[in-house]
Swiss-Prot record:
PANTHER family from the UniProt entry: DISULFIDE BOND FORMATION PROTEIN B
Entry's transmembrane regions: 10-26, 45-61, 68-85, 143-161
Family membership noted in the UniProt record: Belongs to the DsbB family.
Taxon lineage: Bacteria, Pseudomonadati, Pseudomonadota, Gammaproteobacteria, Pseudomonadales
KW Membrane (keyword) present: yes
General function of this protein: Required for disulfide bond formation in some periplasmic proteins. Acts by oxidizing the DsbA protein.
Stretches assigned to the Periplasmic side: 27-44, 86-142
Protein's UniProt name: Disulfide bond formation protein B
MF annotations from Gene Ontology: electron transfer activity; protein-disulfide reductase activity
Residue intervals on the Cytoplasmic side: 1-9, 62-67, 162-163
Length: 163
């Protein structure tokens, strides 16, 4: 049974990622929840996934191209899921063992090399460990991880489907 064409599945994945970013922006600008560094990395991964899916949907590639797009999208999913898992772990660490807060991104961009900025941001901060919102008992990074699992299913479906 054929559920969805490869192109329509890429469109659905793009729309799903656009919805996730819209929710993140709503939470930031309407609910007043400022994103931490790990949240920003997760947003970048969702945007990257969405852009790959959009390009794939516009291009409408054959079997090999579809798998290449799915593999590239899977890289964004893996990075985002790893970041969400890191943030979930930080939320379980006792407060006295959390990393200290970071200086502003503007300052770091002026004063530090890119590799050091990336290391500091991916390490996380006490700000990343704060649970500021929950729904159904799940925090934002847990919901984010659930979204990345859904994206991973799309990638696997596109990688493994037979024509």
């Amino acid at each position: 049974m054929r559920l969805a064409s490869p192109r329509s599945l890429f469109v659905i994945a793009f729309l799903g990622s656009a919805l996730l970013i819209a929710i993140a922006l709503y939470m930031e600008h309407v609910m007043g929840l400022a994103p931490c560094p790990l949240c920003i990395v997760q947003r970048i991964c969702v945007i990257g996934f969405g852009l790959v899916c959009l390009v794939a949907a516009i291009h409408g590639p054959a079997k090999v191209g579809r798998r290449v797009y799915a593999a590239i999208a899977a890289l964004f999913v893996a990075a985002g899921a790893a970041t969400a898992i890191r943030q979930i772990w930080l939320q379980s660490v006792p407060a006295d063992q959390l990393p200290s807060c970071l200086p502003s991104l503007e300052y770091m961009m002026e004063a530090l090399p890119f590799q050091e900025i990336a290391r500091l941001v991916l390490h996380g901060t006490a700000e990343c460990a704060e649970v500021s919102w929950t729904m159904l008992g799940m925090s934002i990074p847990e919901w984010s991880l659930l979204g990345f699992i859904g994206m991973a299913i799309v990638c696997l479906w596109q990688l493994l489907r037979r024509d």
